[in-house]
Amino acid sequence: MMHPWHDVSPGKELPRDFQALIEIPLGSNVKYELDKPTGLLKVDRIIHSAVFYPANYGFIPQTYAEDNDPLDVLVLCQEAVQPLALIKARAIGVMTMIDGGASDDKIIAVATNDPEFSDYLEARDLPPHRLLVLKRFFQDYKQLEGKQVQVEDIRPAYAALTIIEKSLARYQELKEKLIKGEAHE
């Protein structure tokens, strides 16, 4: 069986353009996440209250972020994308959350095949309200669960590209350690 984290290419035009694997569709209040051992999606939780994902949410294959998971990505698109679907995306910014004292980066991207979003190159060019919605979603859903989180200002595309490059390199390091038997996922 193919594993979506390990066996799917992140793309050929990295780091700016990449393939994102969607875990959670736009508008969902079910938080799915990758089950690392099996590669299947599992239901992590149902979000408290009437709070819904403001974008398609997933990860970039063959990346390993500082939170020891694949690198998270929010893909702006007109439509909800089915879980485990691949979508071509372009990084336009990054939002960093401080969750339990740990840094958790969320790449902000646009679907390159969606005519409503494909021309955006920088998050700052989006309507200000859309950026506010992205930030508030993560603040609100954590607070509704009784957790404190700090959502930092959204940074430009060049910051996202650096994080993507580092996460791709960290994945290769992890892969080499796994092959040698020196690490566990």
Language-model segments: what does each one mean?
Residues 1-185:
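Hydrophobic N-terminal alpha-helices or hydrophobic patches in metabolic proteins across all domains
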